[in-house]
Amino acid sequence: MKIVVAIGGSILLKEYDCKKFQEYSEILKSLASEHEIFVVVGGGKPAREYIGVVRELGAGEAQCDDIGIEVTRINAKLLLSALGDAAYQKVPHNFQEALEYSATGKIIVMGGTEPAHSTDAVSAILAEYIHADKLINLTSVDGMYDKDPNKYEDAKLIKEITASEMIEFISGKDTKAGTYEFFDMTAIQMIKRSSLETVIANGYDSENLIKAINGEEVGTKVISK
């Protein structure tokens, strides 16, 4: 299968060390023996902190986005370092480059691409662009909830949801740079338009990636309706 994996920066950089990079590199290398793997890495806390600084300096949202994109590309380079020869050692800056680099048969790792697109959106657009079979989004919670699980103890995990229902749920949410708490609208629209099989799961347990690819019950499954 051709698979796009989105990994939140907060997953890889929670402790600001190399452990998660090493952990994921081993799993990705194993998966690459059977699948064509593309990875999109988020910015996480470092991106939010830098964006906060530049916003205080009076920068507009487009400039804030640019800062965030640069951080995602640094994170991508860190994962490339962990992957070594198993990955193409250059970060694509756009979808065409990602497709071209994939001709090497190696794992492709990228970050953001342009202002106003979160890495969730980038992963969904990339999946459509390369005609991926599956999109796996690894985040800091167990999947999609009916409300913020970090704020509400009674938040319930949604095991299955349609893309149309997600669009209704997300409508009106904040979309400032660095504030994406879940999928943004562009990502969901891409999933719906391309009928893309998507799973959202907790990335702190890297084994969830394997479960999602194997079709086991994990996280939230998004149905492209």
UniProtKB/Swiss-Prot annotation:
One of its GO terms (molecular function) is UMP kinase activity. It is an enzyme of class 2 (transferase). The keyword Glycoprotein does not apply. Pfam families: AA_kinase (PF00696). Inhibited by UTP. It is found in: Cytoplasm. It catalyses: UMP + ATP = UDP + ADP. ATP binds at G9, S10, G44, R48, T139, Y145, D148. Catalyzes the reversible phosphorylation of UMP to UDP. Belongs to the UMP kinase family. This is Uridylate kinase. It comes from Methanobrevibacter smithii (strain ATCC 35061 / DSM 861 / OCM 144 / PS).
